[in-house]
Amino acid sequence: MEEYENLLNRAIDQLPPEVFEHKRFKIPKAYSDIQGNRTFIKNFKDVAEDLNRDPQHVLKFLLRELGTAGNLEGSRAILQGKFTHYLINERLEDYVEKYVICHECNRPDTKIIREDRIFILKCAACGAKAPLKPL
């Protein structure tokens, strides 16, 4: 029994520290302005940084979900069309659910890696891997 406890303690010591942290993850809110027939997301790069994702990847998802064209300009994103901040934040929540949160442990400590031609969501907390749909 003592040997089992020693092995268990050794295994626990080898786990990454993220496993034991219990901080709450909040989905960042996007702040947008509508000017003419374009929508400007003012804090887009900050949102992407908070999600620990490439801004181009987040933008590509948003553009596909909203069915529009757009681009990055500095720290903001410009979308062709009029979109409310409510709709944009709703689509960001969809992005977080599909491309940020681990499907096993529900933590945001993930990275998108590429193995061969497949994109994989790898969790830094539990080590789980899950294939992702390509954008």
From Swiss-Prot:
Keywords, alphabetical: Initiation factor, Protein biosynthesis
Pfam families documented for this protein: eIF-5_eIF-2B
GO molecular-function terms, A-Z: translation initiation factor activity
Keyword flag Protein biosynthesis: yes
Gene3D superfamilies: 3.30.30.170
Superkingdom as given in the UniProt entry: Archaea
Purpose: eIF-2 functions in the early steps of protein synthesis by forming a ternary complex with GTP and initiator tRNA.
NCBIfam families: aIF-2beta (TIGR00311), PRK03988.1 (NF003067)
Family per similarity comment: Belongs to the eIF-2-beta/eIF-5 family.
Database matches in PANTHER family: EUKARYOTIC TRANSLATION INITIATION FACTOR, EUKARYOTIC TRANSLATION INITIATION FACTOR 2 SUBUNIT 2
Subunit structure and binding partners: Heterotrimer composed of an alpha, a beta and a gamma chain.
Protein name per its UniProtKB record: Translation initiation factor 2 subunit beta
Gene: eif2b
